[in-house]
Amino acid sequence: MKRIVVIVLMMAACLGNAQAQLHLKANVQNNHLWRGMEVADGCLILTDLGYTFANGHMTLGLWGGTNTQGSYKEFNHYITLRTGGLEFSAMDTYNFSPGATYNNRQYFNYSAHETGRFLNCTLNYRFQQPRFPLLLSWSTIMFGRDRSADNKEQKYTTFVYAEYPIYNKEGWKVDAGVGGAFALNKAGEKQNFYGNTSGIVHTQLKVSHDLKIGSYTLPVHAMGLWNPQSQKAYFQIGAQIVNL
């Protein structure tokens, strides 16, 4: 892990002058939904601080979230590489909630058998044809709390996802998506990181709109999410309050 950090910092130093840019974004929403799960509820603030360089091809960033009750906290590190419609990202995720059954009290613990973290690697491709802007995504948990029941093997749970904008007119956009999960290494078990068995765990319909308030633009969204495997459904509404 230390070697990876050193390599990334060296790349940043070498490429940092090539059209480098800082950005800060923050959203307020009523819950945090991710891949068929409600990670946290209540009023949340989610933030993204990033440094983009190498002519826009690379971003290093910090992603964080908390709810107003203080029962949920998340602080992640990530790196993103992109070219054309292809994008690769790796996010080192660490989150805390009172009911967690994993180790969420040792931030710097990277022991495979003990850590509460997980490293999620994602490869996205967005078709560049204006008439067919389909998004395809493959994500695998490469390290961390995605283990077999006896804690001897990494399961490499994978989430595959497809999304398509079914409406995009007059400032309104509607995206429909569906995702399924399975373990590359089942380790003799049916369960994976996202559910009790392989299958569809995420279907969504998201409506986005840029709300004009005088000279200010407030991006807002509403989303319905259904998980047929867990028999659960969630509704989310949110707004982007910072975009620098």
What annotation goes with each model-predicted range?
Residues M1-H23, L244:
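Cleavable N-terminal export/targeting peptides
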Residues Q19-Q21, A54-T59, S89, Q128-L134, ...:
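Short loop/turn motifs that connect adjacent beta-strands in outer-membrane beta-barrel proteins
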Residues A20-T52:
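Outer-membrane beta-barrel initiation region
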Residues A26-H32, H57-T68, F88-N95, N103-Y107, ...:
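Transmembrane beta-strand segments that form the barrel wall of outer-membrane beta-barrel proteins
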Residues N30, Y51-F53, L81-T83, D92, ...:
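Residue-level signature of outer-membrane beta-barrel architecture
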Residues T68-Y161, K190-S198:
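Outer-membrane pore/translocation modules
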Residues K173-K212, H221:
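Outer membrane beta-barrel transmembrane domains
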Residues L205, Q231-L244:
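Outer-membrane beta-barrel "beta-signal"
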